[in-house]
Amino acid sequence: AELPDNRYLFRYYIHDPWWLNSPWLDRYGREPHDIYLPMSVSRIDREGNIGLPTHLNFLSIDDTYGNMPTQVPDEVTPHILKARYDAPTAPGPLVWVYPFDEYHDWAINSPGRLPEVYYGDWFIRQAINNGVPLNTVTSTTSFQSAIEKKPELFRESVLITIVPDQGTSLEKRLIAFVKNGGKLIVFGPADHAS
């Protein structure tokens, strides 16, 4: 959701030199779901731009025995290219507005709110594990900046985020978003809400 710059990577294990297996051939069963699903993920920065992985790492070129079978790159490469070709160009149906700065502030200044941090991350993790089609993330800070610069950016999306604290700029932006026809799901404790 927040990065010091625009770089983030997609890493995929085609071979494993440390354990006696080649994930593409053995664990993945030559099925590309672990390529297409992660490569459909995007982040939205403060300018409202869609960010995709800037680096693709493939580990490793050789298998446990030091062999470099051409079958694996021959089969994997077309899926990587297709996933990149079909990469997101707009926010997804659901956009996770991740409270990066809020969680950081709570961890430092309000240790009593640490359970909320864990709850928020675990709630979304479990939702994804249960099939919620979440592929887009932005931070609360980036959301507030992006919506100012591109008011229609999230028009086709449902935002999902924590219940904002009373009187915060996030609360005001989310209320304005909903009043202007935006769709929003909030979750978590409402102890500090309006």
Residue ranges, per PLM feature:
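Hydrophobic targeting/anchoring helices
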Residues: 1-115
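Helical hinge/lid and interdomain linker segments adjacent to catalytic or ligand-binding clefts
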Residues: 114-194
